[in-house]
């Protein structure tokens, strides 16, 4: 009966965090609008081989993540939940692997359930796992690879070992097809310390080639198909998206070596108090095969991405699955022997909640700031933000009431965040970061436009997805579409600032021309170097400028 209650509680937890509130949040640009539009175009065109964005070739990522996103929009429609359905599904599948792997390692159902809840409630997992990017997919394939390798090495018969390595190769292959060759580097680096400490080199060399074969066979059909359709895809994807992005001096998203330290700290909320003890206990028990394996899958990817020049918080998402297992194991030991870490965790959550309440007041219309984040007419959003932090502090306090029994309620600290964050975003943020908000405000003007031009790829993708059209023209800036715009058949999809006046004269009689520009909050739009317009509609950071036929 207790198991049934636990399952009901888990499903309610998942519904409140990962299902019910998702549609209340508008899509963020540039990431969510980009992936939403790529998948919409894939469904509309029926081309499941070559990814396109705004009708242009888009070679920044392989195809598998777009497949999953497209299935999400096909099943649930072109809406906020449909766009995020794929990442939510991948996150929940990863949580299922956490459950299964924890149960296999320790044979403890309670521990397995706790590891799952800890994983799903980690701030970084929740933030990325409900945000339409490709990282939850690659995290799933990496965690699946972690489980597959363990299965292979624990099998006694050659059939079990062979099956495990074949499965490992498939997961690596799908990882390559999701985000590239990092899906090969991370598993290799993660298993090497465990193989070395356990002296299992023989099994690795005997059966490892099976993983290589299954990986190649997984990637080969699509790899050959896109090479035939677009011969330069692999050159661009390997050199630009891997070497330049991560290793060269001009790498994208450059950051210092210690970049991930604050990411780990913030990402571990509301379980931050368990982080030091989980890592220390894992190291202290490194003679235990399972513990050192989880520790290796936590630390090695973190070191790898720290050494790389290009860094983003999403890159280390896969580290938090083994870390959640270590945290759950340590938490049960602490509850049984010395609950000091659990008390510290409760106080950290109280401090975080109280700090958030104070910070919300400071940036509110009633605070000391001359330019508050929220305006007076957005008072309800301020109260939503206060509710988020109040609930965080409340559940932090509740875990201290009987810490040996109530410590696990820290999983409810982000409940307010899950339910209310979509209602607390300031209008000034929505106007710049949520193209849907802009489209809703300017729908009547945008809909009849013959041509739409914009200077932001993220805004362009948002306009295309909302208006269900992929012919948005880039104005003045090419951004990440630079490579796709170099193709001969992309002529006419970019208009420079110097050419705009002539282009306008040539096309004005064909219908309404709409220019959507991103501007600074205090920028005078009358000073823009553009021909006089027939209509201007400013929505803070985005401006709609229209030219009608003469």
Curated annotation (Swiss-Prot):
InterPro entries assigned: ArnT_tfrase, Glyco_trans_39/83, LipidA_mod_glycosyltrf_83
Involved pathway(s): Lipopolysaccharide metabolism; 4-amino-4-deoxy-beta-L-arabinose-lipid A biosynthesis
Origin species: Escherichia coli (strain 55989 / EAEC)
Functional summary from the UniProt entry: Catalyzes the transfer of the L-Ara4N moiety of the glycolipid undecaprenyl phosphate-alpha-L-Ara4N to lipid A. The modified arabinose is attached to lipid A and is required for resistance to polymyxin and cationic antimicrobial peptides.
Catalytic activity, reaction form: 4-amino-4-deoxy-alpha-L-arabinopyranosyl di-trans,octa-cis-undecaprenyl phosphate + lipid IVA = lipid IIA + di-trans,octa-cis-undecaprenyl phosphate
Coiled coil: none
Single GO MF descriptor: mannosyltransferase activity
Name this polypeptide is given: Undecaprenyl phosphate-alpha-4-amino-4-deoxy-L-arabinose arabinosyl transferase
Family to which this protein belongs: Belongs to the glycosyltransferase 83 family.
One Pfam family linked to the record: PMT
GO biological process: lipid A biosynthetic process; lipopolysaccharide biosynthetic process; protein O-linked glycosylation; response to iron(III) ion
Location within or outside the cell: Cell inner membrane
Enzyme Commission code: 2.4.2.43
One GO CC term on file: plasma membrane
Keywords recorded for this protein, A-Z: Cell inner membrane, Cell membrane, Glycosyltransferase, Lipid A biosynthesis, Lipid biosynthesis, Lipid metabolism, Lipopolysaccharide biosynthesis, Membrane, Transferase, Transmembrane, Transmembrane helix
């Amino acid at each position: 009966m207790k198991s049934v209650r636990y399952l009901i509680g888990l499903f309610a937890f998942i519904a409140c965090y990962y299902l019910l509130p998702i549609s209340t949040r508008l899509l963020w640009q540039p990431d969510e609008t980009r992936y939403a539009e790529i998948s919409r175009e894939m469904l509309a065109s029926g081309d499941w081989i070559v990814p396109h964005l705004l009708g242009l070739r888009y070679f920044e990522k392989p195809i598998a993540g777009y497949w999953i996103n497209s299935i999400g929009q096909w099943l649930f429609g072109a809406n906020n939940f449909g766009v995020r359905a794929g990442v939510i599904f991948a996150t929940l599948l990863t949580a299922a692997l956490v459950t299964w792997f924890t149960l296999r390692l320790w044979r403890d159902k309670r521990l397995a359930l706790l590891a799952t809840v800890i994983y799903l409630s980690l701030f970084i997992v929740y933030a990325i796992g409900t945000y339409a990017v490709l990282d939850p997919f690659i995290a799933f394939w990496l965690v699946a690879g972690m489980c597959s390798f363990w299965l292979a090495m624990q099998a006694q018969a050659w059939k079990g070992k062979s099956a495990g390595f074949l499965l490992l190769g498939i997961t690596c292959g799908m990882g390559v097809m999701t985000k590239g060759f990092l899906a090969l580097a991370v598993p290799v680096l993660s298993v090497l310390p465990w193989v070395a400490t356990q002296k299992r080199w023989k099994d690795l060399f005997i059966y490892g080639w099976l993983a290589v074969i299954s990986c190649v066979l997984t990637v080969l059909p699509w790899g050959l198909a896109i090479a035939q359709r677009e011969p330069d895809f692999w050159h661009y994807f390997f050199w630009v998206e891997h070497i330049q992005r991560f290793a060269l001096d001009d790498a994208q998203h450059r950051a210092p070596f210690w970049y991930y330290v604050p990411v780990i700290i913030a990402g571990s909320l509301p379980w931050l108090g368990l982080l030091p003890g989980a890592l220390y206990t894992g190291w202290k028990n490194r003679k235990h095969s399972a513990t050192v394996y989880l520790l290796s899958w936590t630390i090695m990817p973190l070191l790898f991405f720290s050494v790389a020049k290009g860094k983003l918080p999403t890159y280390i998402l896969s580290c938090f699955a083994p870390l959640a297992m270590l945290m759950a194991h340590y938490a049960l030991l602490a509850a049984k022997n010395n609950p000091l870490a659990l008390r510290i965790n409760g106080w950290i959550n109280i401090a975080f909640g109280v700090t958030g309440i104070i910070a919300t007041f400071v940036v509110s219309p009633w605070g000391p700031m001359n330019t508050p984040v929220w305006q007076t007419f957005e008072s309800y959003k301020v109260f939503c933000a206060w509710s988020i932090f109040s609930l965080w502090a409340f559940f932090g306090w509740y875990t201290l009431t009987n810490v040996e029994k109530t410590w696990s309620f820290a999983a409810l600290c982000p409940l307010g965040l899950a339910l209310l964050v979509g209602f607390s975003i300031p209008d000034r943020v929505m106007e710049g970061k949520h193209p849907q908000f802009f489209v809703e405000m300017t729908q009547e003007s945008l809909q009849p436009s013959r041509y739409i031009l914009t200077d932001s790829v993220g805004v362009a993708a948002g306009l295309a997805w909302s208006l269900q059209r992929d012919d948005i023209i880039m104005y003045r800036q090419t951004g990440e579409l630079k490579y796709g715009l170099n193709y001969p058949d992309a002529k006419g999809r970019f208009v420079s600032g110097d050419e705009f006046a002539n282009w306008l004269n040539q096309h004005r009689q064909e219908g309404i021309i709409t220019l959507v520009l991103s501007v600074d909050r205090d920028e005078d739009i009358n000073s823009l170097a553009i021909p006089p317009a027939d209509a201007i509609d400013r929505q803070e950071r985005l401006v709609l400028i229209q030219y009608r036929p003469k």
